[in-house]
Amino acid sequence: MTNETTKTQRAIMAVVAVIGGLYLMLLAPTQAMQTLKIALDQVLLRLVPHDADFYPAVPILSVTFSAWIIAFVFAGALLLVLSKKLYEGAKWARAAALGMFAIPSVAGMTMMIPWFVLVLSEYPEKGVPAHTVTGMPPSMPILFVSLLFYFIMLLADQDTLKNKMLKVVPYTLLGIVSGMVFMNGQHGARYFIHIPGEFVTDASGLISVNPTPPPFTSPLAHYITNLDHLDWRTFDMLSDKAVYSPQTLALLLGGFLLYIASVLLIVSIPLMAMKNKVGWYMATASALATAVVSFQGFVVRSSTEWLQGGLLSSVLLVVLLIPAFKNLLIEKGE
């Protein structure tokens, strides 16, 4: 980003930082928590009794939503502290503010998908009753408010129209890919930690806790070894003898590596805004890693979500390597 800004632009950025900071500290956490509670209520009462595969969504969403909520408060506090420096025209403050608004922008995206999958979607083939909640999630404003402030921070300078149009591409893709790989990470982590033997279908046909789960000494009780004995689609027993399953590695990388990459992509945004080469290398490596892992997940699990994630990561990788974009993100020759 160029550091050439007018007094009006600096005032706008300072006001945006104050409004955005207050929003992230005072309103966004409540909106996110309301979304989480409604989603978990639907999972526990509507979905899990008919399909135990949904249960891992409970700990996964509890942890990730909580992490985002905590990040909102810290980001909001930093934005308030940065507002004076933004008005003074400090480039580093603007880069930091851009990164702070990237956090809720990505988080807002990741909070939409669980709502559609767990709250609004119908699963009649599993015997799941119709949904009782309608409309958009309470967290939806987080996405759009944060995106608005994100682009104000990105574009409020005296750069040429051409350069502004060019830099919108990588800075938008960074957020989209970060959100996409995080959502795919939810899917991977959900199935990675799932232990099917902990659940059983009772006499009424509903899912309940298995009164005699696999003992802790059994490979069926561990998330690294259980799929070597089970059919990964139905979780039926295949063999007492371990048969190496590529599913475990695909889920590990397609879950936790994608989580880490999502965070690294967010961190790279303020670094590249300062034309720090570490940010570009971080983002490029993350795009490459997530492309490879996502395509691997698609091959192993035939998951179209991972195919989409792999394609988006590939697009980001190409964009970061194109000189017209790269020269806006780091100094020439680095």
State where each predicted segment sits.
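Topology signature of small-to-medium multi-pass alpha-helical membrane proteins
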Residues: 1-334
